[in-house]
């Protein structure tokens, strides 16, 4: 638009009349928008993570970013993450969510340490059920009613937790070894 300009030059300083860039030019403005290029769907990246049979996480998440219970991935044994895809970080306390996820993960690690299991990896069918339930529960919530935002991936799959805090607490209380 004629009344808008995208300026990508390095900023020298912000002044009362606008923003002065390193080239000495003063850009008069009414609004200053600082865009950092945040990508809400780049969980764990740019880290290289290779799972069973040489599968690369970048390939697994090339189309959509999903995980089982927001903490584990089928085909990536003994790998866990905090605040992964569909973690309820937009509607609850990040600290409380992280602590509950860590408690769940520690229970799984204790099962491994105690010899109950040799490895821990989410089953694909369990992850598929979890992700389908998340998508179904979004229904007509504000996150999926037509606005494009970081709450949705490029295919419209939700990145948020659509359930209650109580359900999250229940889901993080005791590991289900059938999953």
Segments predicted by a language model, with ranges:
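C-terminal, flexible cofactor-proximal segment of oxidoreductases
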Residues: 67, 80-179
